[in-house]
């Protein structure tokens, strides 16, 4: 997921700064507009990366030339790349929720939910990996499921901030005014 770490091109930091200013002023409309624009940039960049991973999952030898077609490692690489590609929206959700909670200086609430998810991931290692088990792909799928669950729980909690999900979805678009500002 290091590819996703820098894919926002600095727009998350900038968007966080401006959205926080709007939050402090009580300007909910422009706060959501700024977060929506930032989500649009993330969506654009992350979907390109997800598409790249999707293509590489068809031909994993592009990334790892030593893989033998139809081998167990070939299929493991393929499934892991597919799961990584499909989990892109979850990563975007994590980043957006992190912005919303950070703006309010309440990211500790998101961290609590994430901590429960992390504990479940750690405990699941004993199930997926053991003396007779080495279930890497199912483990990675489980981790992504936990990440999705954390995003859904945190998104549910965002309702306490009177965030309109529909209004936010409408704000996910390119906005020239915000682009020039950021």
PLM regions with names:
Residues 15, 19-22, 31, 38, ...:
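Hydrophobic/aromatic residues within transmembrane alpha-helices of membrane transport systems
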Residues 74, 103-104, 131-134:
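Helix-loop interface residues and adjacent transmembrane-helix termini in multi-pass membrane transporters
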Residues 108, 119-152:
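Membrane-interface helix-loop junctions in multi-pass transport and translocation proteins
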Residues 1-23, 42-49, 88-94, 150-153:
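Small-residue-rich midsections of specific transmembrane alpha-helices
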Residues 50-71:
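Short membrane-interface helical motifs at transmembrane helix boundaries
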Residues 68-94, 111, 115, 123, ...:
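Alpha-helical transmembrane segments of multi-pass membrane proteins
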Residues 136-140, 154-182:
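Interhelical loop/hinge segments that connect adjacent transmembrane helices in multipass membrane
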């Amino acid at each position: 997921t290091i590819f996703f770490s820098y894919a926002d091109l600095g727009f998350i930091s900038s968007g966080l700064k401006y959205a926080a200013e709007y939050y402090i002023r009580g300007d909910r409309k422009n706060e959501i507009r700024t977060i929506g624009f930032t989500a649009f940039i993330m969506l654009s960049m992350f979907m390109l990366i997800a598409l790249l991973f999707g293509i590489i999952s068809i031909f994993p030898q592009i990334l790892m030339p030593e893989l033998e077609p139809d081998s167990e490692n070939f299929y493991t690489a393929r499934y892991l790349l597919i799961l990584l590609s499909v989990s892109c929206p979850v990563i975007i959700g994590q980043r957006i929720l992190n912005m919303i909670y950070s703006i309010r200086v309440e990211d500790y609430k998101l961290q609590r939910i994430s901590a429960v998810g992390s504990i479940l991931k750690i405990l699941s290692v004993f199930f997926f990996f053991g003396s007779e088990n080495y279930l890497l792909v199912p483990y990675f799928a489980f981790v992504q499921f936990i990440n999705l669950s954390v995003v859904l729980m945190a998104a549910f909690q965002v309702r306490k901030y009177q965030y309109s999900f529909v209004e936010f979805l409408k704000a996910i678009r390119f906005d020239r005014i915000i682009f020039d500002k950021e």
